[in-house]
C-alpha cells in the first residue's frame, strides 16, 4: 500500500539508522485463528535481516511463526510530544517479511553475538560467555526482509 503522507517518507538510509539505534520494536504475527499478535522484542539488524531471540518454548509467538511465517516489525524513535499544537515528532520504520527459526548453529551464535554487541557493548566478554553457556536454551528468529518503509516528522 502506498503511503499517504509522501512528505514524511524516510529513505533506506534513515530506516537503517532507526533500526541500528533502536533497542526494541513490536513483532506482529498471525495466529492459527487469524488473530494478530504483537510482542515487544529486542533485535539486531545484521546482513540485511533482522534477528530476535526468545526462550526455547512454543508460546504464541513461536507457534504463530510456525503456522504462518508472514510478519511485520515496527520500531518508533525520537518521539517528542507537542501537546500545545496537538502533534508529535517521531521517526518510525515498518518492516515486512518472513520469520523462521534459525537452525544453523553458526548463524545462531553469530546472531546472538550481534545482539550482545548492539545491546550490551560494555559487556562483550561476559556476553560471549553467557551465549556459550545458554544458547541451547533459546531460539533465534530470523526475519527475511521483503519490504521496509519509514515515516517521520521532525
Q: Where would I find each of the regions flagged by the language model?
A:
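A generic structural signal for nonpolar/aromatic side chains embedded in well-ordered alpha-helices
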Residues: 19, 64-65, 115
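Charged, gly/pro-rich active-site loop segments
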Residues: 2-6, 83-154
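Anion-coordinating catalytic cores for phosphoryl-, nucleotidyl-, and glycosidic chemistry
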Residues: 7, 16, 60-62, 73
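Structural motif corresponding to alpha-helix initiation and N-cap regions
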Residues: 12, 58-59
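Active-site-adjacent structural patch at catalytic or cofactor/ligand-binding sites
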Residues: 55-56, 67-80, 89-99
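Short beta-strand segments
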Residues: 22-57, 73-74
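Extreme N-terminal tail/first-helix region
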Residues: 1-21
Amino acid at each position: 500500500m502506498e503511503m499517504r503522507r509522501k512528505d514524511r517518507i524516510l529513505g533506506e538510509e534513515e530506516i537503517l539508522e532507526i533500526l541500528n539505534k533502536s533497542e526494541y520494536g513490536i513483532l506482529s504475527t498471525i495466529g492459527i485463528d487469524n488473530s494478530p499478535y504483537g510482542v515487544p522484542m529486542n533485535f539486531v539488524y545484521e546482513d540485511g535481516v533482522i534477528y530476535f531471540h526468545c526462550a526455547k518454548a512454543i508460546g504464541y509467538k513461536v507457534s504463530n511463526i510456525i503456522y504462518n511465517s508472514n510478519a511485520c516489525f515496527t520500531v518508533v524513535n525520537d518521539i517528542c510530544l507537542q501537546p500545545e499544537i496537538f502533534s508529535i515528532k517521531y521517526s518510525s520504520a515498518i518492516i515486512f517479511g518472513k520469520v523462521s527459526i534459525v537452525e544453523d548453529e553458526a548463524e545462531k551464535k553469530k546472531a546472538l553475538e550481534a545482539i550482545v554487541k548492539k545491546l550490551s557493548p560494555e559487556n562483550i566478554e561476559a556476553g560471549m560467555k553467557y551465549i556459550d553457556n545458554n544458547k541451547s536454551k533459546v531460539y533465534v528468529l530470523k526475519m527475511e526482509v521483503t519490504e521496509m518503509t519509514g515515516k517521520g516528522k521532525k
